[in-house]
């Protein structure tokens, strides 16, 4: 890099002698000592070239270069750079071009910029040396303002209908991005994803506690739809610490709730349940009826995954009643959809389907593709169990089709489980294996081991139907082991039942012994009947 910059300077001034060039480099080396202990010749050469190139910049470009060293993340766009500088975006783009032309900044993609690590260190050192302390403190605040308000604008598209925080206006020199549509918001979120954690970390390190908790709260809904829940958890933990530091109990409950949702997204149900329990306790203490209903609903989602069906049904019913009383149609609809899932899991299909169809109509009316896809997944499962495999296939395929618009791998991976099951039942084993394989890959990347295990389980059942017993057993054993490790006794029992060995069936019966719903009773009867048939064959 140093040779490239020096060579370009030499070419741009062919009348300059080599001795003059070397003298200039040496003279400009004094201001920066970050790269060398003084006896490292290579580092010293790089340092002096950086200094020389920096000193050749116009003052406004040099100032931008310095301030960019204070950006918290690895890459940035012109709007974030403008916020750091407190300058108009159009002028900032011109200055960025100047820095790229001087090889002090790289441009890996259109409207994206990054430093070489050594240049970042140099820029940061120059900011410390040449910028007044007030300017060094104001620039990071401005860029954090920009992230907060742009993320807030993005979540309006990414989580329509969700609750938005009241925010103070940004610094007058900050121009947040406005989005025309969903895809623009997703594009921004995906580009900036790697900056979210560093931004919140920078806010925490600077003692900007209000920025810290608000950024964390807003970024839950503004994160890229296909982001891993594990990526957000450290963001949420920092926000939670900031809320506690402020003694802001509503903010603490909100962050606790979202940390719980993050744990659930990666299959950590015990941690999720504890977070929702704490959020519920705070909201009860505050007398926040809507918040209590929200925490109750989320707590019961975890109970549902743990198959505590009676408790989940009772609590979902309570939450739905509160939301309805408060005129909150969207969360009331979510609670009703969750009730339909409870009834399906209990084997009460005649109750589950009418609720699911009503929610489907509501989501279609509102144009809520995420909600629609989720309820279509449930309807597909109901159709499959009631002997309508072709209908189940069409329904699951529609759900996955909606994901293409949403660009959400979390939803795609989940809905592919329903599509794979329908494809297998409809006599399309090859297609089913493709769906389960992609679901497994997506869930592995997202860090959701429980759903990854469900994809293995689905593949194992397809292989079993094809008579490829060795491959079936390998997938099913792997799935059963993962479910056991995660404490998911119901799905472990299903995997063991599919394996079909006498020891497997006995273990499955033990696992589902606590369940008293119609589905569990029917499965126990099936397991016992299979055991009797096996004994008669002997």
Placement of each model-derived feature along the sequence:
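C-terminal non-catalytic interaction modules
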Residues: 478-481, 485-538
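Conserved positions within tetratricopeptide repeat
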Residues: 4, 93, 137, 141, ...
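Inter-helical turn/loop elements of alpha-helical hairpins
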Residues: 102, 106-110, 156-162, 186-189, ...
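Inward-facing hydrophobic residues that define packing positions of alpha-helical scaffold repeats
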Residues: 7, 22, 96, 196, ...
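Aliphatic-rich helical/repeat scaffold segments used for oligomerization and domain docking
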Residues: 1-223
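Residue signature of alpha-solenoid helical repeat architecture, marking inter-repeat boundaries
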Residues: 190, 206, 210, 227-230, ...
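TPR/Sel1-like alpha-solenoid repeat signature
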Residues: 252-263, 269, 275, 282, ...
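Amphipathic alpha-helical segments of tetratricopeptide repeats
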Residues: 200, 240-241, 277-288, 318-327, ...
């Amino acid at each position: 890099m140093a040779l490239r910059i020096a060579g370009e300077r030499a070419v741009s001034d062919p009348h300059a002698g080599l001795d003059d060039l070397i003298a200039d480099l040496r003279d400009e080396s004094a201001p920066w000592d970050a790269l060398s202990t003084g006896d490292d010749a290579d580092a010293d050469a790089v340092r002096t070239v950086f200094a020389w190139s920096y000193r050749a910049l116009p003052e406004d470009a040099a100032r931008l270069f310095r301030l960019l060293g204070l950006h918290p993340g690895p890459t940035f766009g012109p709007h974030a750079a403008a916020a750091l500088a407190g300058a108009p975006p159009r002028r900032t783009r011109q200055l960025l071009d100047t820095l790229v032309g001087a090889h002090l900044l790289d441009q890996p993609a259109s409207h994206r910029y990054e430093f070489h690590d050594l240049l970042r260190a140099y820029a940061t050192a120059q900011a410390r040396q040449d910028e007044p302390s007030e300017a060094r403190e104001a620039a990071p605040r401005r860029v954090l303002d920009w992230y907060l308000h742009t993320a807030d604008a993005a979540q309006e598209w990414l989580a329509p209908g969700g609750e938005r925080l009241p925010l103070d206006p940004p610094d007058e020199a900050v121009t947040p991005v406005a989005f025309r549509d969903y895809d623009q918001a997703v594009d921004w979120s995906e580009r900036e994803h790697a900056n979210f954690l560093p931004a919140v970390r920078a806010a925490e390190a600077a003692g900007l506690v209000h920025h810290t908790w608000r950024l964390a709260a807003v970024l839950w809904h503004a994160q890229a739809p296909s982001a891993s829940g594990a990526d957000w958890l450290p963001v949420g933990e920092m926000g939670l610490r900031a809320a506690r530091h402020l003694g802001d109990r509503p903010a603490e409950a909100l962050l606790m709730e979202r940390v719980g949702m993050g744990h659930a997204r990666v299959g950590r149900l015990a941690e999720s349940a504890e977070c929702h329990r704490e959020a519920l306790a705070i909201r009860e203490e505050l007398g926040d009826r809507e918040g209590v209903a929200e925490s109750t609903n989320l707590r019961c989602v975890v109970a549902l995954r743990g198959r505590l069906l009676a408790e989940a049904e009772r609590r979902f019913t309570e939450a739905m009643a509160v939301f309805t009383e408060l005129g909150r149609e969207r969360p009331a609809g979510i609670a009703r959809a969750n009730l339909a899932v409870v009834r399906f899991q209990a084997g009460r299909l005649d109750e589950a389907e009418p609720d699911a169809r009503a929610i489907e109509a509501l989501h279609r009316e509102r144009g809520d593709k995420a909600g629609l896809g989720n309820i279509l997944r449930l309807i597909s499962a109901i159709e499959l169990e009631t002997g309508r495999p072709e209908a189940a296939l069409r329904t699951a395929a529609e759900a996955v089709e909606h994901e293409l618009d949403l660009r959400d791998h979390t939803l795609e991976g989940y809905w592919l489980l329903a599509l794979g099951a329908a494809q297998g039942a409809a006599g399309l084993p090859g297609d089913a294996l493709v769906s389960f394989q992609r679901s497994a890959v997506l869930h592995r990347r997202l860090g959701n081991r429980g759903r990854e295990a469900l994809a293995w389980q689905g593949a194992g059942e397809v292989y079993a139907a094809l008579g490829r017993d060795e491959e079936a057993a390998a997938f099913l054993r792997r799935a059963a082991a993962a479910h056991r490790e995660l404490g998911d006794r119901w799905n472990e029992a299903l995997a063991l039942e599919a394996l079909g060995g006498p020891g497997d069936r006995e273990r499955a019966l033990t696992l589902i012994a606590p369940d008293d719903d119609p589905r569990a009773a029917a499965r126990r009867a099936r397991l016992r009947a299979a055991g009797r048939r096996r004994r008669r064959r002997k």
